[in-house]
Amino acid sequence: MSVNVDATSSSGASEVRHDWTLAEVNALFAMPFNDLLFKAQCVHRAHFDPNYVQVSTLLSIKTGACPEDCKYCPQSARYDTGLEKERLMEIEKVIQRAREAKAAGSTRFCMGAAWRNPKERDMPYVTDMVREVKKLGLETCMTLGMLTREQAIALQQAGLDYYNHNLDTSPEFYGDIITTRTYQDRLNTLDAVREAGMNVCSGGIVGMGETGSDRSGLLMQLANLEHQPESVPINMLVKVKGTPMENVEDLDYFEFIRTIAVARIMMPKSFVRLSAGREAMNEQMQAMCFMAGANSIFYGCKLLTTSNPETHEDVMLFKKLGINAKQTREYSDEAHQAALLDEIQTNEAPQAPEMFYDATQKKPETVNI
């Protein structure tokens, strides 16, 4: 069977498709590595400045005790990971973290709660969080679990810019990872978010023991949505002791980079976020991910409950690569550069209290918020 994968043809570099077949996606993954990266870079340059990366900060506003059974997640109440449970964070503390994120160069502030879905009693608090963070001039994103259409509308009316709800993996592999909510439940939440008028952030996790065809299936599901997600986080599994996935075999790093590249080709106008798992990646691998089309990262020492490179390490890597973080609307060029220089100069300073428990550490730690 002959499959056309020339994504850099005159139409391929600008066309957003919603009719990808599994054979086409598998063929992209099977390309010689250098050819695949070249195609992905060409598509990337057709739609984005290749030397700019969007920067977000992720804060856990409610940690642990989640009733779901996602096998990768240390926040599930079903697994003994030593994670300290935390109630919904006070709005004042959230706003302080948002100010710190903006000072470090983030343009988007993402707030995550370990819920199956938000309760109605929680909605006034989370909508107030959105309004207050928006006042700082930051874009806002939330991940709160499944949403009803009414909840999605309430978040949109509060000013929420993005809602994150990952598909995680292919429909075929999904049942091996999660049983407490269906794939269709996830798609229904994405529909509710889109119909409410918000931007969609949706991606998945690789390295959970899935096949190459499952990685193709995940990207096919995302790309073939009626409207492709504006933001596509690609996570490398962070194995946490106590979860069912603590001993899963590592994914080859080249396969991860291929996943970034194929996502870029299939979703040419989406921001592809290099997300969880970056702490285990050296600078050279991260640089290859940027070459493959990743153009968004999270700043900060934690992603919810797992480690992330320190902010100053990202600043130094950007400097080496000639990459500039996408600036907040209020930042002038001079102010932005001053913020980056200040970050470099203070990277030896004593660290502020941790926002999150590090679920990848062997010994439990106390969460200081």
Curated annotation (Swiss-Prot):
Catalytic activity, as annotated: (4R,5S)-dethiobiotin + (sulfur carrier)-SH + 2 reduced [2Fe-2S]-[ferredoxin] + 2 S-adenosyl-L-methionine = (sulfur carrier)-H + biotin + 2 5'-deoxyadenosine + 2 L-methionine + 2 oxidized [2Fe-2S]-[ferredoxin]
Record pathway: Cofactor biosynthesis; biotin biosynthesis; biotin from 7,8-diaminononanoate: step 2/2
Residues annotated as binding [2Fe-2S] cluster: 110, 141, 201, 273
One Gene Ontology MF term: 4 iron, 4 sulfur cluster binding
Record-listed [4Fe-4S] cluster binding positions: 66, 70, 73
Cofactor(s) demanded: [4Fe-4S] cluster; [2Fe-2S] cluster
Stored CDD domains: Radical_SAM (cd01335)
Keywords: 2Fe-2S, 4Fe-4S, Biotin biosynthesis, Iron, Iron-sulfur, Metal-binding, S-adenosyl-L-methionine, Transferase
SMART domains referenced in this protein's UniProt entry, alphabetically: BATS, Elp3
Cofactor binding, note field: Binds 1 [4Fe-4S] cluster. The cluster is coordinated with 3 cysteines and an exchangeable S-adenosyl-L-methionine. Binds 1 [2Fe-2S] cluster. The cluster is coordinated with 3 cysteines and 1 arginine.
Transmembrane recorded as keyword: no
Residues of the Radical SAM core domain: 51-269
Pfam families: BATS, Radical_SAM
InterPro entries: Aldolase_TIM, BATS_dom, Biotin_synth/BioAB, Biotin_synthase, Elp3/MiaA/NifB-like_rSAM, rSAM
EC number: 2.8.1.6
GO biological process, one term: biotin biosynthetic process
NCBIfam families recorded: bioB (TIGR00433)
Function, in words: Catalyzes the conversion of dethiobiotin (DTB) to biotin by the insertion of a sulfur atom into dethiobiotin via a radical-based mechanism.
Oligomeric form and interacting partners: Homodimer.
Family statement drawn from the similarity comment of this UniProt entry: Belongs to the radical SAM superfamily. Biotin synthase family.
Annotated protein name in UniProt: Biotin synthase
Organism: Pseudoalteromonas atlantica (strain T6c / ATCC BAA-1087)
